[in-house]
Regions:
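Ribonuclease/tRNase effector modules and their secretory precursors
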Residues: 1-100
């Protein structure tokens, strides 16, 4: 996947994105929702990437919060967050919330 980084992602937030990838890794996107002109893509390891509406420009990336993930699943039409995903998100939040 070829992605262009915005100045924000490539300069201002690159350390945060790199730390998330180093701590959590990244296997695959498990959920994608569109909000206004942005695509929010959640990975199975709990990283949330924000892209432009085409999905080719990365705006930012960060550790997903339980609140954001619950909101995303609700917007996608799910009654609740899948158990495995919720476990990952809440564990990350408890363990790493002060690091980011």
């Amino acid at each position: 996947m070829n992605v262009i980084l915005t100045h924000h992602a490539g300069v201002e937030r690159i350390d945060r994105i790199a730390n998330c990838l180093a701590l959590f890794g990244m296997n695959e996107f498990i959920l994608e929702i569109k909000e206004s002109s942005r695509l929010f893509r959640l990975t199975d390891t709990g990283i949330l990437f924000v892209f432009d509406e085409t999905g080719s420009v990365l705006i930012t990336g960060y550790m997903a919060t339980p609140e954001k993930v619950a909101s995303m699943y609700k917007r996608a039409g799910y009654a609740q967050v899948p158990r495995n995903t919720w476990s990952v998100i809440t564990r990350n939040s408890r363990t790493y919330r002060m690091k980011f």
